[in-house]
């Protein structure tokens, strides 16, 4: 039986050799590339899981999670590191000497990590590589959402201006690629944190590809054309 240590070691090797991840981290000037980073990490872990998936046959979600938990927490840590770098860049852009808050390993993040094991255990047929990658990517994108939520709330509590945008991804992967009313209801553009929170901006269902972006400043002039905070 494959061990959690073996899976984690294989995942770390793939992370270290992935040039795209290194490039995304170097160019993290905000949250615009955060979902891409989370998806890329998800693909790397999915490759590792696919290589040992046959050993999960007959195991329940709890047993599978016991093997994958260290790697799923490593995935969280990688995405959280990107988010912290992105948040620092946002404060720098706004001329604010503030420290970025790292997204905590919350109940929501932990639950979505566990859903990876549930998805594997409950599948009637072996999951495809794409299916595995989507499961892990969802867990990673939840980290991005939590980071934006945490830092936007902190900025609002300090009396800073915030601008939050949630963009609908165009399809609902969970419902046969038909328009997703749940996501469309949560898409929008808000100039204060509380309105975004009340609208469900930071929520995400499995298969959701919506993108959330966030900027902060003492005073703001948002240009839709430039897409930057001035």
Predicted feature locations:
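Domain-core detector
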Residues: 1-205, 213-230
């Amino acid at each position: 039986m494959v061990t959690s240590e073996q899976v984690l070691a294989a995942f770390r090797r793939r992370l270290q050799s992935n040039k795209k991840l290194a490039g995304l981290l170097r160019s993290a000037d905000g949250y615009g590339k955060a979902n891409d980073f989370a998806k890329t990490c998800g693909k790397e872990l999915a490759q590792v899981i696919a290589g040992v998936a046959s050993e999960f046959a007959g195991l329940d979600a709890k047993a599978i999670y016991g093997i994958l938990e260290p790697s799923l927490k490593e995935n969280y840590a990688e995405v959280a590191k990107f988010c912290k770098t992105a948040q620092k860049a946002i404060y720098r852009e706004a001329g604010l000497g503030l420290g970025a808050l790292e997204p905590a390993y919350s109940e929501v993040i932990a639950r979505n990590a566990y859903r990876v094991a549930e998805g594997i255990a409950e599948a009637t047929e072996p999951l495809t590589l794409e299916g595995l990658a989507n499961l892990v990517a969802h867990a990673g994108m939840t980290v991005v959402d939590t980071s934006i939520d945490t830092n936007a709330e902190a900025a609002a509590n300090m009396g800073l201006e915030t601008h939050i945008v949630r963009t609908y991804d165009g399809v609902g992967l969970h419902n046969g690629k038909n328009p997703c009313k749940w996501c469309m209801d949560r898409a929008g553009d808000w100039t204060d944190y509380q309105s975004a929170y009340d609208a469900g901006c930071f929520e995400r269902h499995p298969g959701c590809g919506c993108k959330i972006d966030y900027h902060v400043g003492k005073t703001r002039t948002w240009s839709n054309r430039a897409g930057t905070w001035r």
